[in-house]
């Protein structure tokens, strides 16, 4: 075995080390052959056109003969003689083809003989899009360039890169020189011009501004740190943009091939393209953007059935927390970096590849090619930063070849026990000649394999993969050279985002108590793991040799089946009754718990009784045996409210005394003292002690509210909030009296200044109360009207700043919510418990939606208007797509940023114990379920709502949040 491996190594070296001249000759010969094939194809096409013309002429002659046959005999004889004399050259062809003309089909010429389908996979920013663009330029069927699109995109990349550097300098608490502050404002205003589809009016002046900002010592420090810190990294090739800024801003600028390849244009969908190499057609499908995660690879085989896989690995991203902390000399930057975890993209890519090797996509593919993307940055990094910081067992020092070999073995070790041909290639994807040299051999080998398997039909929507003309084909390629050693899996798999799990579990709760005030709210939860029922299976599906066993020593699990949510957040302006919407709207519930299953806990007492267990007809009667006779009489009456029964044992005792509310009152005085702190803090000074009471139909709620707010690591505090336990007592209301108590809570997270959020603090709820819809009792429409009116007021008074917002209106037992941007609200709902004596657990119910520019639905809305999402931001600048203010994005007919809110309406029950409103400074670091559990624990410890809010904000700060943090907690005490 060792001899064979040694021979394979030797043969591989001999194959991979030809002289440069011989390579050039081979390439020249290949080009000549390709040109000859193109000439032959053109000649065949011309012959085909001549055949078509001849067939048309023959058909015309037949029609003429038919017309002549109906004329007089004398005239027909003359005409037939004339026709015979004038068409002697075509008479033979007409007579010979007359009988078979209708049965003979004209041959269709193809530009290819064989074909294949390739899926390009890899981790984030590994070079997948770069590879696909390079292959399109080298072998593409059509010209991939769109000059106007890429000119605008590259212009946006250049501006977005500088804006990102400026924002990161603020995050790191380092200030640019005073001379550049005015230039910063001019640069930050340019995305607005881009939104209006205009290039800069004074391009040379803008280029000079960009040059001065780029050469600032602070920006250079941020750029150098971004190369090793994933938290402040700028996607794409920032240095390339900066070096070419004067060319980009030239009015006569036309993008080059390298400009197009270097342009960063994140797509969250599968990117498809077709190439042809020596009459071998390849359909490429690249998974970029959000599709880079392994959880999104589950349905790829069912939908595309790729024959081969290209897995791209970026070698330059191997930095760890310790390396970042020790390599930077700026104490301010080091302090900031200690507050967040640095992603090691190389290890993440290794984990993703291990997950891939245990998936159906890998098992059904014919071969896999590992593409190690070096680029110039890797060779620069390996000289400065030892790979040992990432892999403790590495002993190769700063030698690039040893480092590449070591990393390659880390990946190929997962393939050693797999019955799968594979091969690794080291390529600089930015070097067109290097890409051509490597992929000439790759496509030559793939063409041979496709020819053996008989893949002649290209990919289309009906067959989903090239179809073999041979049928069942059991031939397999031999294993490619493999020198890797099996090592047990040492790296933990990527944990699924808890936030995504929370949203995906909304279908698990069938007892919907939340309704929505608009028929176009985000409600669809669409699975991406569906199969194509009409797809035609390729020959590889019938190959029994594809079954592979997972390595028993691996620590990774199989690729999980997940679902992704695609939602719509547009709202309608028409008024709808909540009673009509109750049947059409769904509740966004996070967690599993189904209230209708609560009576099932009665079954445990049956188990110790063996004679009664095998009797199925007696199952509905057991409730009468373990409980007194009075309880079965109460159950038929209270079947509509099962949530109230699983409460602690004290509740049935209290149910016998419904007319005695004096027992819970001793616990209320301390709660009133806690809320008094809040009433004196934010616009609730008018609220008295009785304002905490909130009555409902058949029940009463005692409210306890509080807030916690931190400036955090930002230079300014741009958050504001409102707590009004008694809304009607705090505002001037001229409408009909409201007999039911109403409370209002809100958080406004400003950006670009404090003007907008400060103005929203007294404005939104006043607009809400003074609207006609509020007087009529249509609170859903009142929220829409209030948000629109408040936005108009803000736009008139605030030029540059903006703000997100989340609001909650509690009317009796109904909770109305609205939000724009990434400020959110979560309701804590008690889960049904089979054991009444057991602890109460809560599930988070998400009552808001994140309107980010990176969201699929929001991105579609913006791009349909002609907008651009660069670096997951609106024109590279604004992170949210819905907000108050942000005047520059709302001017003109095309409003790229809007203030239409996402709304929910919830009928609260005794199972709902508290809700949390907060800005993204909390939710970016704390998951929904974590926040609910945190509040639950502190309530048990007897802490007030204010204390809990402050502790929760501090917890987010300790986790490394660099934003302002504002948290509101409202506790619902039911009587």
UniProtKB/Swiss-Prot annotation:
Q: Which InterPro entries match?
A: Gprotein_alpha_su, GproteinA_insert, P-loop_NTPase, PP2C, PP2C_BS, PPM-type-like_dom_sf, PPM-type_phosphatase-like_dom
Q: Where is this region: G4 motif?
A: 369-376
Q: What is its EC number?
A: 3.1.3.16
Give TM segment ranges. none
What subcellular compartments does it reside in? Cytoplasm, Cytosol; Cell membrane
Binding of Mn(2+) 2 occurs at 920, 963
Compositional bias of kind Low complexity? 460-478, 500-515, 544-587
Protein family (similarity comment): In the N-terminal section; belongs to the G-alpha family.
Q: What is this protein called?
A: Protein spalten
Q: Which organism is it from?
A: Dictyostelium discoideum (Social amoeba)
